[in-house]
Curated annotation (Swiss-Prot):
Gene3D superfamilies: Lipase, subunit A. The keyword Disulfide bond applies. This is Prokineticin Bm8-e. InterPro entries: Prokineticin, Prokineticin_domain. Potent agonist for both PKR1/PROKR1 and PKR2/PROKR2, and inducer of a potent and long-lasting hyperalgesia. Also potentiates capsaicin-induced TRPV1 current, when tested on DRG neurons. At subnanomolar concentrations, this protein both induces potent chemotaxis of macrophages and stimulates LPS-induced production of the pro-inflammatory cytokines IL-1 and IL-12. In vivo, potently stimulates the contraction of the guinea-pig gastrointestinal (GI) smooth muscle (nanomolar concentration). Its main location: secreted. Expressed by the skin glands. The lineage of its organism: Eukaryota, Metazoa, Chordata, Craniata, Vertebrata. SUPFAM superfamilies: Colipase-like (SSF57190). Belongs to the AVIT (prokineticin) family. It holds the Pfam family Prokineticin.
Length: 96
């Protein structure tokens, strides 16, 4: 029951946060549709969701660039969309 309550809270937080799009629960990129990756939850690396690839100006992880990735992603951020890179911009990395 505790796990269920945590998942419900997690989904509510993500649903009401700016720009969050969740397309489904997954384990690996191959389970997600085109233009998405299977990213770890920011709250628990044991929970993963299909999340859209990063667009221009969105935060990214510099080491997360392969799609599909055959393993389990540890980052809560997907790589940037095709044609974009993930350079450092100020204090964080952003797709550009």
């Amino acid at each position: 029951m505790k796990c269920f309550a945590q998942i419900v809270v997690l989904l509510l937080v993500i649903a009401f946060s700016h720009g969050a799009v969740i397309t489904g629960v997954c384990d690996r990129d191959a389970q997600c549709g085109s233009g998405t990756c299977c990213a770890a939850s920011a709250f628990s690396r044991n929970i993963r969701f299909c999340v859209p690839l990063g667009n221009n100006g969105e935060e990214c992880h510099p080491a997360s660039h392969k799609v599909p990735y055959n393993g389990k992603r540890l980052s809560s951020l997907c790589p940037c969309n095709t044609g974009l890179t993930c350079p450092k911009s100020g204090e964080k990395f952003q797709c550009s």
